[in-house]
A protein has these predicted regions:
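Key DNA-contact positions within bacterial/archaeal DNA-binding proteins
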Residues: 22, 33, 62
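Recognition helix of helix-turn-helix/homeodomain-like DNA-binding domains
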Residues: 30-44
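DNA major-groove recognition helix of helix-turn-helix/homeodomain DNA-binding modules
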Residues: 48-63
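Short, charged recognition helix plus adjacent turn
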Residues: 12, 18, 65-72
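A short, Lys/Arg-rich alpha-helix, primarily the initiator
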Residues: 1-19
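DNA major-groove recognition helix of helix-turn-helix
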Residues: 39, 49, 68
Length: 72
């Protein structure tokens, strides 16, 4: 059975745009640890936070996530 899992691409976009975790944390008013957890997909940002992330990173919301398909 094929399944999909969604992972955020925040780390990838930060690297592409040469933006630091510290800068993103300051812009969003969250800790650097929170950004680190998002970048490793340990936790996920809320919907309002995703909107703010897309604004700060100047990217579309759809670019913040990717689907990973696998068989279970």
């Amino acid at each position: 059975m094929e399944k999909k899992e969604y992972r955020n691409r925040i780390r990838v976009i930060l690297a592409e745009k040469m933006i630091t975790n510290t800068y993103l944390a300051e812009q969003l008013g969250v800790s650097k640890m929170t950004i680190s957890r998002w970048c490793t997909n340990t936790t996920q940002p809320s919907a309002p936070q995703l909107i703010e992330i897309s604004r700060v990173l100047q990217c579309d919301l759809k670019d913040l996530y990717e689907a990973i398909e696998y068989y279970a």
